[in-house]
Design a protein with these regions (language model features):
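Extreme N-terminal, non-catalytic leader segments
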Residues: 1-6
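P-loop (Walker A) phosphate-binding loop of NTP-binding proteins
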Residues: 12
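Hydrophobic positions on the alpha1 helix immediately C-terminal to the Walker A/P-loop
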Residues: 20
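N-terminal phosphate/diphosphate-binding loop that engages ATP/GTP or pyrophosphate donors
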Residues: 27-92
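ATP-dependent NMP and nucleoside kinases share a basic, alpha-helical "lid"
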Residues: 88-167
């Protein structure tokens, strides 16, 4: 059994990475690091300053001003702070998805956040999800998983999530946004979305949440020797 281990979960937007990773971390009693939330926090900081997220120079210039903090509440849930203010809810607004995707393609942003992410894995056993965890952030992760589902399935899941938050959007718009983001994330020059050679691919499209979680946990335990 690994004394300290790391689990890297990659996959496209809306594949259920965050929800499943949180549940798996709770079941295993380890820390969950939501890297998407970290990039969304940078995106939110850019948004609040009225900066074009595609303007790499302008975004890089304000990075030193962003006092970004990652901490965990009493329930063990990750919270994000920006300049001392908790922005965990604000960064989940639908428009922040595009901001996160654009700023995450900027080399200066990735360099700015890379050490913060790696430091979490050095400190403790973690499950970390994102787009390039197994290929760039934690290339030596104990377990690498590529979680996926068809765009249509992911759009339906996203619509339900938005409805529960009281911010519903039309299915067609959500699907279009997901397809557009898939293309952008897969074709960007810096750390494009791709499956690590040694990652296990799990397609949850036809599975319930409980079935998906069971499959994920079984894979982690087998690969990590738990």
């Amino acid at each position: 059994m690994a004394e300290k281990y790391s689990v890297a979960i990659d996959g496209p937007s809306g594949a259920g990475k965050s929800t499943l990773a949180k549940a798996a971390a709770a079941a295993l009693g380890i820390c969950y690091v939501d890297t998407g939330a970290i990039y969304r926090t940078i995106g939110y900081g850019v948004y609040c300053r009225g900066i074009d997220p595609s303007d790499a120079a302008a975004v890089a210039a304000v990075l030193p001003e962003m006092r970004l903090e990652l901490h965990y509440d009493q329930a063990g849930l990750q919270r994000m702070k920006l300049a001392g203010r908790d922005v965990t809810e604000e960064i989940r607004l639908p428009e922040m998805s595009k901001y996160a995707s654009k700023v995450s393609a900027i080399p200066a942003v990735r360099d700015f956040l890379l050490e913060l992410q790696r430091d979490q894995a050095r400190r403790r056993s973690v499950i970390m999800d994102g787009r390039d965890i197994g290929t760039v952030v934690l290339p030596d992760a104990t377990v690498k998983i590529f979680l996926t589902a068809a765009p249509e399935v992911r759009a339906m899941r996203r619509c339900r999530e938005l409805e529960q938050r009281g911010t519903p959007q039309p299915y067609e718009q959500v699907l279009r946004d997901i397809v557009d983001r898939d293309w952008a994330d897969s074709h960007r020059d810096i750390a494009p979305l791709c499956k690590a050679e040694d990652a296990v691919e799990l397609d949850t499209g036809a599975l319930t949440f409980d079935e998906s979680l069971r499959l994920l946990l079984d894979t982690i335990r087998r690969r990590a020797g738990l």
